[in-house]
C-alpha cells in the first residue's frame, strides 16, 4: 500500500455512507447521478476522479451544491443545479466526502 493510498483512506475514514446516501435520496440526487453510472449528470466516481488531488475539492463541490449555478446536459440545454437542502452543513460535507471517496 502506498503512502498516498493510506492518506486517502484516512481522509475518508469518517464518512457516514448511509447518511450520505439518505441525504442524496431525500434531495433527488440519484435522479441525475449514479455512483458509478452516468445519468443526466456525471457518475459520482467520475466526479471523484476529476477532483483527485485537488486540495480545494471539498470547497468546490460544497459551493456547487449550494449555489444553484447552471449545469450543461449532454443534449446541450442548461438548468440550474438543484440546491442541496440540509439543516446541518456537516451533512453536506459528509455527502461531498462520500462522493470523493468513490
Regions found by a protein language model. Give the residues of each.
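Solvent-exposed loop/turn segments at secondary-structure junctions
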Residues: 37-39, 102
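Electrostatic cytochrome c docking/interface patches
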Residues: 8-24, 50-52
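Protein kinase-like catalytic domain
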Residues: 33, 66, 99-100
Amino acid at each position: 500500500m502506498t503512502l498516498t493510498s493510506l492518506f486517502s483512506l484516512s481522509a475518508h475514514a469518517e464518512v457516514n455512507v448511509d447518511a450520505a446516501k439518505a441525504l442524496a435520496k431525500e434531495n433527488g440526487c440519484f435522479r441525475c447521478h449514479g455512483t458509478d453510472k452516468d445519468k443526466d449528470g456525471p457518475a459520482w466516481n467520475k466526479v471523484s476522479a476529476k477532483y483527485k488531488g485537488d486540495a480545494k475539492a471539498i470547497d468546490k463541490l460544497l459551493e456547487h451544491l449550494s449555489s444553484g449555478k447552471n449545469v450543461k446536459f449532454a443534449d446541450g440545454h442548461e438548468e440550474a443545479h438543484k440546491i442541496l437542502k440540509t439543516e446541518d452543513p456537516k451533512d453536506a460535507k459528509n455527502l461531498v466526502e462520500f462522493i470523493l471517496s468513490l
